Amino acid sequence: KTLGAIGKEFSTLEKVEGFDGNIIDISKPPFEGNFEDLFQLCGIDGNMSYENFEDNYKFNFSWNPDHFSSVLMWVSNKGRTEYPWNSNHVTVGFEPISSAFGLSTHISLNKENPIYKRNVATSIKLFKDKPLYSNYSFSISNL
């Protein structure tokens, strides 16, 4: 079951158009209902933080935004009914990417795709004899 409206843009996690047309806040899981969904957050500056007030910690994550210009946010909110999840799994994940996620490699490489047209890279050029090195860091601290 999908949480967010398909193909809609938003500028804050607190105001995302839902699949049913209502505005939802995806910044504070868990949510009512059972959902599995992905959101592409475009043009991220290479820094994200996640605050867990229940367990009193803050997770900081940074990476090279020249390599990964977006973040794929995946939301698992009891939407996986099969074993071993059995509708009990609740989590949010963040994965730095450079792609037009879910729209194929062909579209990600095409400079006419809607994400690239907004100056957000959707691919990384790799070379056989030149390894790509990319730095990242993460830390956890008390709130």
Please report, for each region that a protein language model flagged, where it lies by residue:
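Active-site/ligand-binding surface loops and adjacent short beta/alpha elements
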Residues: K1-H67
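Active-site pocket scaffolds in enzymes
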Residues: F59-L143
